[in-house]
Amino acid sequence: MWKRGRLRPQNAPERRIRQFAQLICQSEWLFSEMLVQPSVKGMRQLLCQPSLTVTEKQSMVTLPPAIGKQSMDILLINTLLPYRYAYAVAHQDHVGAQTALKLMQEIPAENNTIIRQWQMLGQQVRTAADTQALIQLYQHYCQNERCIHCEVGQQVFRLNHIDVDSNNK
């Protein structure tokens, strides 16, 4: 069951599934092309297929691309680049794995609640690689109240003159 609270119509799950199916149909070799694409710009172009729709007269009309740059980047950050990295590691392709990491560093940082909280603590966030690392720290340490086991949490304790070593048992 999909949650639709505060969901814009253009982001409805049915619409996104239709767009993804259309993308797959329009590009027979999409997966292969994504694996060898050397740039973020090239990966965005693969995702930037024009959208087709049916008018009242059942004629096909080409519309502007179905998703914007920010949505493409979110797809790259959360789906395609991690998959590309995992695929490279599974096939012992060290160059491919490094390329996936390099591409993650070329995408601008996400802007979300978790990242804004890190920035309020003074953490510099420049790239998608930074945001993914900070989200991982948040999910592993902050959400589980494991501050004392986290390097960042320990630094905050030291700044507030809380003895970390006596509490770390």
Roles of regions detected by a PLM:
Residues M1-Q132:
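Hydrophobic, aromatic-lined core segments that form the binding pocket/scaffold
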